[in-house]
Amino acid sequence: NDSKEPWQVFSAEDRAKILETDRPTYVTVLDCNHSFKEGTDEPQGGLKYRGPMYFDWDAKDGIVAVMDSVREFMEMLESLTFDVSQARWYLSGSRGVHCEIPQECFMDPRIIAAGVGNLHLAYKRFAFEHITPYLDMRVYTGKRGRQWRTTCNNRGTEDNPRYKVAITADQLREITDEEMYKELCKTPCHSVEVTPPTLNRQLKVEVQVALDDNKLRVRKNSK
């Protein structure tokens, strides 16, 4: 049962190893510089986050409507001269699609290494500015953050398996009906070849504007 898995804290550097050996159903989508264990104080300088800009589409209206929305979002990214093959795309296994854009596509390495305060709010702002139907805005939470389903475990039954699966941008564009979606989700696929990330200046500007706007709001609210 997904809900019975206990909260555990691991080093961000061990993420890949934990996914391979422990096979958790969920992990936090962002790394954080605080364990949130009872009795521990927040780090001096506040909470800092690191991780991809993430998006989650989900609908009860059927996968065709969701796929149209995702393709619209992909076209928006391409209008920013972003190569969508640099993003990681997933079928959630239940009428949904996940997208992760590597932080290296819009931030300098030294900033990524140091961590960024309120990173989830900058991602939320970007999602709001470019929202398409069925994009879930509830996933942008702080502190422990969003629990992100992994590709490790079957969320269906033995006779009717349903996995979250990795998929390429080109494959995603070819899904035209629910049967194609379900067929792809029957077999585990943990990763696909992704184009190495390169810095996209338009994405960088948009995320930085979102971060600056949030800092301004925090300063105004503190007065």
Q: In which residue ranges do the predicted regions lie?
A:
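Flexible loop/turn segments at secondary-structure boundaries
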Residues: 96-98, 157-158
